[in-house]
Regions:
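Catalytic alpha/beta core domains of metabolic enzymes, predominantly
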Residues: 30-35, 40-168
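Glycine-rich phosphate-binding "P-loop"
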Residues: 15-25, 111-119
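Short helix-terminating capping/connector loops at secondary-structure junctions
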Residues: 11-16, 134-138
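Short glycine-rich or small-residue beta-strand-to-loop segments that form or flank ligand, phosphate
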Residues: 1, 19-20, 140-142
Length: 174
């Protein structure tokens, strides 16, 4: 149904939308979920890299039978990154490690939402996703959280034109 609706929008407007289902599941099911999403016409698949683990992101990204891009989502990251005395830095987890796992796109929070993400961390996550790093391809930043047409120009100013906007809540609330 989603892919048919996306195709109808394209025919009417000339703008292409990509359906990106969440395939996060038990580890033994994620790869099959990716294959099934691809068979059903999804243009991308999302895995919660925190809940499922970046190893699962890597397994799907490296599987030759999965030809659609993989988006690694960040839900739950705060439990690992927000303690100033323990854990892991969000720029390392969501930026560099997500990229090393092979994610084509990496979701991160926005400084324009109610979540208290520091601007410095936001910019360092994007930098780690996109900076030159040996022969690794960049990971496309997917900025989400409080995204709407009013703050899109600021995000493009912060991140550049090579950015995906995670507008799930904005669409659902419309």
């Amino acid at each position: 149904a989603y892919t048919a609706a996306a195709e109808q929008v394209y025919q009417e407007t000339g703008h292409r939308a990509v359906y990106c289902p969440n395939i996060t599941d038990r580890p033994e099911r994620i790869l099959e979920n990716a294959r099934r999403a691809q068979e059903l016409g999804a243009g991308m698949a999302m895995i919660n890299g925190v809940a499922a683990g970046l190893g699962m992101v890597q397994a799907v990204a490296e599987d030759a039978s999965v030809a659609i891009p993989i988006l690694s989502h960040y839900a739950g990251t705060g439990t690992l990154t927000e303690n100033p005395r323990a854990g892991i830095s969000s720029p390392l987890l969501l930026g560099k490690l997500t990229r090393l796992a092979g994610a084509d796109a990496g979701a991160l929070g926005s400084v324009y939402s109610s979540y208290p993400l520091l601007r410095d961390k936001y910019l360092r996550i994007v930098h780690n996703q996109t900076m030159p790093l040996f022969d690794l391809k960049p990971t496309l930043p997917c900025v989400g959280g409080g995204i709407h047409p009013g703050n899109t120009p600021r995000i493009v100013e912060d991140v550049g034109l090579d950015v995906m906007l995670g507008v799930g809540g904005a669409i659902q609330g419309h």
